[in-house]
């Protein structure tokens, strides 16, 4: 049985963990919503079908597996437009700033960059750049879910409807 001090300490730890996850979910949500703003321009530029909208709308759903090559092409286009990647790969400085612009503190922003960097290193060296970026995105999604930072489907749907 816990004594009063142990119970208070346990409550403080639980609250601090909750508060660390909630803002991180907000950061990922805000980054995602801003990231997709250029989607129509990328679809037009690359002549991509509207079917990729479903992948973007459901991206953070744990049960949704993204397999469409065109979605990888769109992610690559959006990342380039936001200057998050260059010809040599992830642009760490710009990605760090992008996370901070969407509410991340230094620690969360660095963790996001580290996750993206780790995923870039972990994906197989595929010849097709769209498929490579798709694998990179799937890795990042899985890592964000492990941290419990993925925004809920309900929150994302409500935010997207609010933007329309």
UniProtKB/Swiss-Prot annotation:
<comment type="function">
    <text>This major soluble protein in olfactory sensilla of male moths serves to solubilize the extremely hydrophobic pheromone molecules such as bombykol and to transport pheromone through the aqueous lymph to receptors located on olfactory cilia.</text>
</comment>
<dbReference type="InterPro" id="IPR036728">
    <property type="entry name" value="PBP_GOBP_sf"/>
</dbReference>
<keyword id="KW-0732">Signal</keyword>
<dbReference type="GO" id="GO:0019236">
    <property type="term" value="P:response to pheromone"/>
</dbReference>
<comment type="subunit">
    <text>Monomer and disulfide-linked dimers.</text>
</comment>
<keyword id="KW-0589">Pheromone response</keyword>
<keyword id="KW-0590">Pheromone-binding</keyword>
<feature type="signal peptide">
    <location>
        <begin position="1"/>
        <end position="23"/>
    </location>
</feature>
<keyword id="KW-0813">Transport</keyword>
<feature type="disulfide bond">
    <location>
        <begin position="73"/>
        <end position="130"/>
    </location>
</feature>
<keyword id="KW-1015">Disulfide bond</keyword>
<feature type="disulfide bond">
    <location>
        <begin position="42"/>
        <end position="77"/>
    </location>
</feature>
<dbReference type="InterPro" id="IPR006072">
    <property type="entry name" value="Odorant/phero-bd_Lep"/>
</dbReference>
<comment type="similarity">
    <text>Belongs to the PBP/GOBP family.</text>
</comment>
<dbReference type="Pfam" id="PF01395">
    <property type="entry name" value="PBP_GOBP"/>
</dbReference>
<feature type="disulfide bond">
    <location>
        <begin position="119"/>
        <end position="139"/>
    </location>
</feature>
<dbReference type="InterPro" id="IPR006170">
    <property type="entry name" value="PBP/GOBP"/>
</dbReference>
<protein>
    <recommendedName>
        <fullName>Pheromone-binding protein 2</fullName>
    </recommendedName>
</protein>
<dbReference type="GO" id="GO:0005550">
    <property type="term" value="F:pheromone binding"/>
</dbReference>
């Amino acid at each position: 049985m816990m004594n009063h001090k142990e119970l208070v300490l346990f409550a403080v730890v639980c609250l601090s963990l909750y508060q660390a996850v909630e803002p991180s979910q907000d950061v990922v949500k805000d980054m995602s919503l801003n990231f997709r703003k250029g989607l129509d321009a990328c679809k037009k530029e690359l002549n991509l079908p509207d079917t990729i909208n479903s992948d973007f709308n459901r991206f953070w759903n744990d049960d949704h597996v993204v397999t469409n090559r065109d979605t990888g092409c769109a992610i690559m286009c959006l990342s380039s437009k936001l200057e998050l990647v260059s010809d040599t790969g992830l642009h760490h400085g710009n990605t760090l700033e992008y996370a901070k612009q969407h509410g991340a503190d230094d620690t969360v922003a660095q963790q996001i960059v580290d996750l993206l960097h780790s995923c870039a290193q972990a994906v197989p060296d595929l010849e097709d750049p769209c498929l490579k970026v798709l694998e990179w995105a799937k890795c990042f999604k899985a890592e964000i879910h492990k941290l419990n930072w993925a925004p809920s489907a309900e929150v994302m749907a409500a935010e997207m409807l609010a933007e329309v």
